[in-house]
Every structure is written in C-alpha cells, then in structure tokens.
Curated annotation (Swiss-Prot):
Quaternary structure annotation from Swiss-Prot or TrEMBL: Part of the 30S ribosomal subunit. Forms a loose heterodimer with protein S19. Forms two bridges to the 50S subunit in the 70S ribosome.
UniProt organism field: Parvibaculum lavamentivorans (strain DS-1 / DSM 13023 / NCIMB 13966)
Assigned keywords, A-Z: Ribonucleoprotein, Ribosomal protein, RNA-binding, rRNA-binding, tRNA-binding
Database matches in InterPro entries: Rbsml_uS13_C, Ribosomal_uS13, Ribosomal_uS13-like_H2TH, Ribosomal_uS13_bac-type, Ribosomal_uS13_CS
GO cellular component: cytosol; small ribosomal subunit
Name of this chain's protein: Small ribosomal subunit protein uS13
SUPFAM superfamilies named among the record's database cross-references: S13-like H2TH domain
NCBIfam families assigned to the protein according to its UniProt record, in alphabetical order: uS13_bact (TIGR03631)
Record-annotated membrane-spanning stretches: none
Function comment: Located at the top of the head of the 30S subunit, it contacts several helices of the 16S rRNA. In the 70S ribosome it contacts the 23S rRNA (bridge B1a) and protein L5 of the 50S subunit (bridge B1b), connecting the 2 subunits; these bridges are implicated in subunit movement. Contacts the tRNAs in the A and P-sites.
Region (Disordered): 99-122
Length: 122
C-alpha cells in the first residue's frame, strides 16, 4: 500500500481512482497529476515503481493543497467570515444555510432534527 500525503492509497485500483482517496484531489486533479508526472491513467498502483510514487508525492506537495492543510484553510476561511460579522458569517454562526436556500421548510440537514412544539398533540 503506497502512502501519499498521509493517506494509504489502495494498491489494486488505477492510479487516477486511487488518488481521489486523498482529500482535496478529485478526478480532474488526479488526471492532471498523472499527466504532469507522465504516468498512464490505466496503470494500477501496484505496478508503480518507487520513483514514480515519489514523483507523484512531490507533485502533490508542490502544486496542491490537500488533507490537513486544506481542512485548516477552509475552517480558517469560515472563522474569518464569522469574525467579520458579515451575513455569511452570521449564517455560519447560527447554523443556518449560507447560500440563500429557503428555511421556512426543509434545511433540516443544516438546522438539525426538528424540535417538538408544545400544543401540537391531538
């Protein structure tokens, strides 16, 4: 099992699919990485040489923000919005949808389970 960016990559999958197990790398970025390193997309992880794994690791470290650094960046951006007190920050603080969705009905994922209202029993 190859270890890239602190993640164990599955050995029997194709390289493009295996790279998507890293947080911050999707299908498009995985294909870009394979293109820059010069690895065919059909090659499987267990067929890679140690030098190719090192090349992939260096390309990811050099060009992309992944795993813990990416998570930290996103949380710092949200914290910055909350500290500014802008509308989006207030929505994050209250735990409501941020991007303009309706909240009269729905939005249960963001708001949490429904709270019982007294006087609604039959």
């Amino acid at each position: 099992m190859a270890r890239i960016a602190g993640v164990n990559i599955p050995t029997n999958k194709r390289v493009v699919i295996a790279l998507t197990y890293i947080h911050g790398i999707g299908n498009t970025k995985a294909k870009e990485i394979c293109g820059t390193v010069g690895i065919p997309a059909e090659r499987r992880v267990n067929e890679l040489t140690d030098a190719e794994v090192i090349q992939i690791r260096e390309a990811i470290d050099r060009d992309y923000l992944v795993e813990g650094d990416l998570r930290r960046e996103v949380s710092m951006n949200i914290k910055r919005l909350m500290d500014l007190g802008c509308y989006r920050g207030l929505r994050h603080r209250k735990g409501l949808p941020v991007r303009g969705q309706r909240t009269h009905t729905n939005a249960r994922t963001r708001k949490g389970p429904a709270k019982a209202i007294a006087g609604k029993k039959k």
